[in-house]
């Protein structure tokens, strides 16, 4: 193996730059050439490849987003489109591709490997929705961003003695909502893993809190459930307490990565190069019990969600 390429795909996540830096510098240290692919699979199809060196990744570990840019590429599901991508990689002399992204990005990597391109996946998504790894790159930073926002919202919620319903990202995974809720002392956490929730029961919980002396309530709502505005109106009508909805949106994806995400991304990026040099392909890198692991991509994508029910139950007790 002489040359590898690296791309970021799908939604951006804080820490992607730290992972890029780790891959590039580890690869160069091992005597490999590195090419960056701009704008994910879409950029690959357009031949947007360029040579990278140590300087290319200087002063980026502290930056959010991705210096390689990112994009979604639904047309990559077409095999003829993927064959065109393989031809482009071959034309540049690329022996292997490192893909940083979520499950959709991993699926693209898996399909490329079936066409003869060695691929390795790094988990880059704030959603923490990849079951094979305890944490994904970007989750910790997004969590801290959410908690910081909740702290500010709680200030005004306390002043106005109102209910604040805060919708957070995570797609169909409730990890961000759960961890943010327990970290911020939320009165209620609503996640898709717990099934359809009872709006009337939520209202009773809020009223019970008021009877026990609580002057305000914070409700964390996962976007997999959604409907923050509608829920706030319902709560206000049934409880008689002023309620406001806040959808945090894309602020959760931005900002300088946390120290934890920088360390995680660096460890995962370095391991990706090592696995490639061992001749492996169609693998994904992750962390389990603080140990860096690699796993077959098919096995990883087939694993079921790992929602922490014990932590949810702790949050339920502490919120009363």
UniProtKB/Swiss-Prot annotation:
Keywords from the UniProt entry: Allosteric enzyme, ATP-binding, Cytoplasm, Glycolysis, Kinase, Magnesium, Metal-binding, Nucleotide-binding, Transferase
Assembly: Homotetramer.
Reactions this protein catalyses: beta-D-fructose 6-phosphate + ATP = beta-D-fructose 1,6-bisphosphate + ADP + H(+)
Cofactor requirements of the protein: Mg(2+)
E.C. number: 2.7.1.11
Domain of life: Bacteria
Binding site for ADP: 21-25, 154, 185-187, 214-216
Function: Catalyzes the phosphorylation of D-fructose 6-phosphate to fructose 1,6-bisphosphate by ATP, the first committing step of glycolysis.
Family, as annotated: Belongs to the phosphofructokinase type A (PFKA) family. ATP-dependent PFK group I subfamily. Prokaryotic clade 'B1' sub-subfamily.
Reported regulation of activity: Allosterically activated by ADP and other diphosphonucleosides, and allosterically inhibited by phosphoenolpyruvate.
Cellular component, GO, one term: 6-phosphofructokinase complex
UniProt-recorded Gene Ontology molecular function terms: 6-phosphofructokinase activity; AMP binding; ATP binding; fructose-6-phosphate binding; identical protein binding; metal ion binding; monosaccharide binding
Signal peptide coordinates: none
Protein name per the record: ATP-dependent 6-phosphofructokinase
Biological process, per Gene Ontology: canonical glycolysis; fructose 1,6-bisphosphate metabolic process; fructose 6-phosphate metabolic process
Main location: cytoplasm
Record flagged with keyword Transit peptide: no
Residues engaged in binding Mg(2+): 103
Gene: pfkA
Matching PANTHER family: ATP-DEPENDENT 6-PHOSPHOFRUCTOKINASE (PTHR13697:SF4), PHOSPHOFRUCTOKINASE (PTHR13697)
Coiled-coil intervals: none
Positions of substrate binding: 125-127, 162, 169-171, 223, 244, 250-253
SUPFAM superfamilies found in the cross-reference section: Phosphofructokinase (SSF53784)
Localization terms from the record: Cytoplasm
């Amino acid at each position: 193996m002489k040359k590898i390429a690296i791309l970021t795909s799908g939604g951006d996540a804080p820490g992607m730059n730290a992972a890029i830096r780790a891959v590039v510098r580890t690869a160069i240290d091992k005597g490999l050439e590195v090419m960056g692919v701009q704008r994910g699979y879409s950029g690959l199809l357009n031949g947007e490849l360029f040579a990278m060196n140590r300087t290319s990744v200087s002063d980026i570990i502290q930056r959010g987003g991705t210096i390689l840019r990112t994009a979604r590429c639904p047309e990559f599901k077409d095999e003829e489109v993927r064959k065109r991508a393989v031809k482009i990689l071959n034309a540049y002399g690329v022996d292997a591709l490192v893909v940083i992204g979520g499950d959709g990005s991993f699926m693209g990597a898996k399909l490329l490997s079936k066409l003869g391109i060695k691929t390795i996946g790094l988990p880059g998504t704030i959603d923490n929705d990849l079951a094979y790894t305890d944490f994904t790159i970007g989750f910790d930073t997004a969590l801290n961003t959410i908690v910081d926002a909740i702290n500010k919202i709680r200030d005004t919620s306390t002043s106005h003695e109102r209910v604040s319903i805060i919708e957070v990202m995570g797609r169909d995974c409730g990890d961000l909502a759960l961890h943010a809720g327990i970290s911020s002392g939320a009165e209620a956490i609503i996640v898709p893993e717990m099934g359809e929730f009872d709006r009337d029961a939520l209202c009773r919980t809020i009223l019970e809190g008021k009877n026990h002396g609580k002057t305000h309530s914070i409700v964390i709502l996962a976007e997999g459930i959604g409907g923050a505005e509608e829920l706030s109106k319902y709560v206000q009508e049934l409880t008689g307490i002023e309620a406001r909805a806040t959808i945090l949106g894309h602020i959760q994806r931005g900002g300088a990565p946390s120290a934890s995400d920088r360390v995680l991304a660096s460890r995962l990026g370095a391991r990706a190069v090592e696995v490639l040099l061992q001749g492996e392909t169609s693998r994904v890198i992750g962390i389990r019990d603080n140990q860096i692991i690699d796993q077959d991509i098919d096995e990883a994508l087939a694993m079921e969600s790992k929602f922490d029910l014990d932590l949810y139950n702790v949050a339920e007790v502490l919120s009363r």
